[in-house]
């Protein structure tokens, strides 16, 4: 299983929230001018929305929109959180038939102050992921006994 812990911006969730991403879309893939649907990579068989089973109990399950830059305005695709890497990881896992789990810490509101908020919230994200990781390990040990 490939596990991605990372940071995200969101218009839907408050800073400090950890979410479990189980759907992934490319938020900046737009070749609609060539007749393709928003989010579709031309001449690929991969669907624009990738979905994986939810694996993090107790966390909100969300759709993640990945792209190449910080979001500071309204999005053209529907997603709950925004990052720069999860879709690519999900795509590789789909191509390789690997399981994929993704948890994100909301560092910013995906707005004009996203870059500054992201930077100042990184230490909180690291601490939150350490706690999440330790709880997953403890739960796994309990499940084995």
PLM region descriptions:
Residues 1-144:
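Glycine-rich phosphate- or other oxyanion-binding loops that anchor nucleotides, phosphorylated ligands
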